[in-house]
Amino acid sequence: MLLLFSYVKAQDFSFGKISKEDFDQDTYAPHAEAIVLQEFGRARIEYQDIKGELVLRFYYHTKIFIKNKEGLDYANFTVPLYKSNSNRETIDGIKGITYNLLEDGKIEKIDLEKKNILTEKVSENRDAVKIALANVKEGSIIELRYTTESPFLYNLESWQFQSYIPKKHSEFISEIPEICQYNVNMKGYVKLDTRKTLPYDTKIVTSTGDVRGTQTIYIAKNIPAFIREDYMTSPKNFMGTLTFELASFSIPFGPRHNYTSTWENVRDQLYGADNFGKELSRTGLFKSILPTVIKDDMTPYAKANAIYNYIKSQIKWNKSYGLFTDNGVKKALEQRSGNTADINLALISALQAANIDASPVILSTRDNGMPALFRPTITDYNYVVAHIELDSIEYLLDASDAHAPFGNLPLRCINYQGNLLKKTGYKWVKLESLLSSRVSYDFTGELSEDGTLRGTLNSMRNGYSATNRREEIFSHNSLEEYKEKVYEETVNYRINNHEIHNLDDPSQMLTETQEIEFKNFANINGGDLKFIPFITGKTTKNPFNLDERSYPVDLGSNLEESFILNIKLPTSYTIKNKPKNINMALADKSARYLYIIKESEGTLIVQIQSLINKPIFLPDEYLDLKEFFSHIIQSQSLDITVGKSSI
């Protein structure tokens, strides 16, 4: 009786049942684009008599209220289906309804039509079924259910309790026979209201008796929407999600097949792959070329740097990530194009050809999510870079980024740890930026009595700030086109001359020099001049606006921004009113802000510096960081008043 009672409680909600009260969602999550009213899923492993094999059946049912036009996309669904050789996943039982509340109080129902169900080929191993509910508008409720069947027991669907819209009720049931063992992991910050485990009848019978099974029920209620904010890695690192990994499978009284791997197995599998390990041994392609790239009297560092720059110049990144090569090193060199693996495995081969010990580091990019560090698997990884060690200093190199300095990984790669896979072993290496993202502004000029400011503005960039600016410049057809765009988009002041230095050398600071004329920089107030002492670089928006943040702030690198302003005042002018000088820091000195205004021999000197001395802030540090930026914004909105001295 206990089993029956529990099973009845853990059940799907009725399809097609709707009431007028369901449309009244004004007070629930008032700022949401849409609301999941109910959501139910079940993953069940069954024995299929016709095929004589176990299959994984996944049932999904949801009901969503569309609050406004921004939520209309939630009436469109994409269901991925995996295929391999003759085996493939299938979908059936697709049924959908759109409900609209009419003015007379009646509820209109529009059934999903077959023409709104399309299957597209995504790749050789994956299709996508796209479902679009019809006649959806603001205030609609949509309902959808379907079932997928998979012969791939390792592909048990993850259950995403949290999404970008709130959910009132989300329920998932897994029903797994004892012959299958899964590692189950709940990640994110969603608290489950119910989690209980019960025995259930698998209906799988062997010559030795029935196979027992375990039913686990997971329920969460009133789940808030996940809110994306600046400075974070992939949201899927932090959304409340239930994941399953097949650990082992066994035939009753037969052998057990283990699916959980080891890092040694992962290394051996990669080194044995034609599009990975084979491409690491392409040293012969570079033996004849290297004498034109490096010289015998070079230091190992200089040789590595020269080879790094050579590969960057020979193979252009095609904007595709890859743990495995698309074209292979030889073809990438011939076509002068390739994905990240084509480029970086070529780099490793070239370094090895120069007798520099180079090995691959596999990693997961920031947008791909955090890999499971204690679960050896290839599927979590989508990228490879090169590792070398010179004079006891380790360097990670990515030659796919044409504007990255030697040893500084692109921001996309800064995602906690990567795995260094040598032929003799493996180890974890930190993925971190060696350089602070730095921008410095320096202005020297003269203020006229009519409020016009004229002078020279220098901006100097390093780290990711320089990389981003170089990418922006090279996205234009020419340097002159870039300058023209800057000229057109600069509305506060006129640029009379614009020079750029060190554009082609990422190892140097990128410098831009502009001769500017800023009319109405200062407002005339009686005989005084009143102005905010910023030409550019002013902080106007706080990147942190949540009341609390459950996931870390990840900046990618330390940040540094400074501004030095030297303005010669009109004759006999002096400071009459100015903001107070500021020297503030967080308690652990992880962030600091200086704002100093002074006058010397008729020249106004403004010095501003903001430093963020670590790349990651934990959730309990969030409010302090938010307040820190609020003080910066407040200080940079205050005026300085200068006028003729009364002496």
Short names for language-model regions:
Residues 1-4:
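Bacterial N-terminal signal peptides
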Residues 11-647:
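A sensor for short, sequence-defined functional sites
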